[in-house]
């Protein structure tokens, strides 16, 4: 009996800014969006806890090659925490480990918050996806195993108190990659001497993506249903919401090159481009229309070396053809 061939979906290239709902994992959200778009390949760029809502950039197709730049980008969050109760997960989904009275003034809270601004060291939560010997820490935590974790450097660019009412505080956080908001709240609670845990968490920004470009699952499913009812190919409407794949690397300096040099780059060769930066990653574009072809890095000899190349459709003409 022959195996039924598995349908792999269509080629989609670009980025959607999903407004992830609470109560599901980031991977669950990813799979739903992948199904809606009928996409062959997709990946998200930094997991949100099931409790958390907000911006979850999802990359399709060739855009997945540039997801690491979004993983490394700054993030912004809105978080509400409850003082006086500490949990093992540092959020409301965990088990309570201590209950203490709250006797904190706004001045004391302001002084405590100041300790967390700037460059600090943070110990990741045991209930995180960080790997130890190939397994995420949360698997050990669920088995009651405590793994020693080293503190890691992070940067809190801004930490603003938006509301303080009795046993609840609301904060806005602008932070570097690798920051765990649950750990931040847990550390704050311990510094205040009363304990604390996250009760609401929303990511409002990743890199420079505006939050008004986010779409939720309800809206995407609504578009899909309308297309089916009207006999319209879903891609005609869904793909209008895709952001260009190079939006993931807009923060990189652009190096524009003529087609003859781009032909060498697409074959994996480094090239010398006038006026290129002297170091770091660059966003490579071609010709007067600045067509995005990938991300390069400046070598020690000053040449632009390809690191991640876009491969869509036919190949570009080779260097010999361009030189004719």
Swiss-Prot record:
Entry's transmembrane regions: none
List of catalytic residues: 49
UniProtKB keywords: Isomerase, tRNA processing
Reaction(s) catalysed (UniProt annotation): uridine(55) in tRNA = pseudouridine(55) in tRNA
Taxonomic superkingdom: Bacteria
UniProt KW Isomerase keyword: yes
Enzyme nomenclature, EC number: 5.4.99.25
InterPro entries: PsdUridine_synth_cat_dom_sf (IPR020103), PsdUridine_synth_N (IPR002501), PUA-like_sf (IPR015947), PUA_sf (IPR036974), tRNA_psdUridine_synth_TruB (IPR014780), tRNA_sdUridine_synth_fam1_C (IPR015240), TruB_C (IPR032819)
Molecular function GO labels: RNA binding; tRNA pseudouridine(55) synthase activity
A biological process term (GO) from this entry: tRNA pseudouridine synthesis
Family, as annotated: Belongs to the pseudouridine synthase TruB family. Type 1 subfamily.
Entry function: Responsible for synthesis of pseudouridine from uracil-55 in the psi GC loop of transfer RNAs.
Protein name, per record: tRNA pseudouridine synthase B
């Amino acid at each position: 009996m022959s195996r039924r061939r598995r349908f792999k979906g269509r080629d989609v290239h670009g980025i959607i800014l999903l407004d992830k709902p609470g109560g599901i994992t980031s991977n669950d959200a990813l799979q739903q969006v992948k199904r809606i778009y009928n996409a062959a390949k997709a990946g998200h760029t930094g997991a949100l806890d099931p409790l958390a809502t907000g911006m979850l950039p999802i990359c399709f197709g060739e855009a997945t090659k540039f997801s690491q730049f979004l993983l490394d980008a700054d993030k912004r969050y809105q978080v509400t925490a409850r003082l006086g109760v500490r949990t093992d997960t540092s959020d409301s989904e965990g088990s309570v480990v201590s209950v203490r009275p709250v006797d904190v003034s706004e001045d004391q809270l302001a002084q405590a918050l100041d300790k967390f601004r700037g460059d600090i060291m943070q110990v990741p939560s045991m209930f995180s996806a960080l790997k130890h010997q190939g397994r995420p820490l949360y698997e050990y935590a669920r088995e009651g195993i405590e793994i020693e974790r080293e503190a890691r450097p992070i940067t809190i660019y801004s930490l603003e108190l938006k509301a303080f009412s009795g046993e609840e505080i609301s904060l806005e956080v602008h932070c570097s990659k690798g920051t765990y908001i649950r750990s931040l709240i847990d550390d704050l609670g311990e510094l205040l001497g009363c304990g604390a845990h996250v009760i609401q968490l929303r990511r409002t920004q990743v890199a420079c993506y505006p939050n008004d470009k986010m779409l939720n699952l309800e809206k995407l499913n609504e578009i899909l249903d309308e297309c089916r009812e009207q006999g319209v190919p879903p891609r005609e409407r869904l793909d209008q919401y895709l952001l260009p794949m190079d939006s993931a690397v807009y923060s990189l300096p652009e190096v524009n090159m003529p087609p003859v040099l781009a032909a060498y780059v697409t074959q994996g060769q480094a090239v010398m481009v006038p006026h290129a930066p002297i170091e770091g990653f660059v966003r490579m574009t071609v010709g007067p229309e600045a067509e995005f072809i990938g991300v390069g890095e400046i070598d020690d000899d000053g040449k632009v070396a390809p690191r991640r190349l876009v491969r869509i459709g036919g190949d570009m003409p080779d260097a010999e053809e361009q030189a004719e």
